[in-house]
A protein has these predicted regions:
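Beta-rich carbohydrate-recognition modules and glycan-binding surfaces
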Residues: 22-186
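Intrinsic low-complexity, intrinsically disordered segments enriched in polar/basic residues
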Residues: 1-3, 20-23
Length: 186
């Protein structure tokens, strides 16, 4: 009986180790279910004197949960952005090759911003653009397509250094209207 108990304990520990290592290798993804407002923050150029207006709401339609970012982006007063951002847990995207996002919108161009351990100043980020359509689409962007915001940053992003991801309406006067059903790393 004692030998059987030890064998079961060893098997149980092996299963725990295998499942925890598998879980550690899963990459971050968010489908905006289960209190997304605790993971995502909205802010605009008003933090630096700009006058862009916007908001983010979380909802669902036809069984699909999503974040909905709307607003007016204005470049007056050296502004020009509204943004939805999420902090990325350390080591949760170490093996990532890129970012994917399931979106629909108003036909405008939007941006993904990644901040890393090396983006120390508020205006530093890595950026990639995508166009929205009125139908749901999944856009995949390799990390190699992200462009640094300045020469002080490394040319290439190391996945293990990623600290946050942002979805941004940026850079020109326009109306923003974007729904995001899922975002993650691949």
């Amino acid at each position: 009986m004692m030998i059987l108990g030890r064998r079961m304990l060893k098997i149980g520990l092996a299963v725990l180790l295998i499942s925890s290592s598998t879980t550690a290798e899963e990459l971050m993804k968010d489908n905006f279910e289960s209190q997304p407002e605790t993971r995502w923050s909205y802010f605009s150029d008003q933090v630096m004197g700009g006058i862009s207006q916007g908001r983010v709401t979380f909802g669902s339609q036809d069984g699909e949960s999503f974040a909905h970012m709307t607003g007016q982006v204005s470049t007056e007063n050296n502004g020009g952005f509204i943004q939805l951002r999420r902090v990325i847990a350390k080591n949760s995207v170490d093996s990532a090759a890129g970012v994917y996002i399931k979106v629909r919108g108003n036909g405008q161009q939007y941006y993904l911003h990644l901040r890393t351990a090396g983006t120390l100043l508020p205006w530093q980020y890595y950026q990639a653009s995508f166009a929205s359509t009125s139908d749901w689409q999944t856009v995949r962007v390799p990390l190699s397509d992200f462009v640094r915001s300045g020469n002080w940053l490394s040319k290439a992003i190391r996945a293990s250094s990623i600290r946050s991801i942002g979805i941004v309406a940026y850079g020109r006067d326009h109306s923003a209207d974007l729904q995001i059903a899922e975002i993650g790393f691949y």
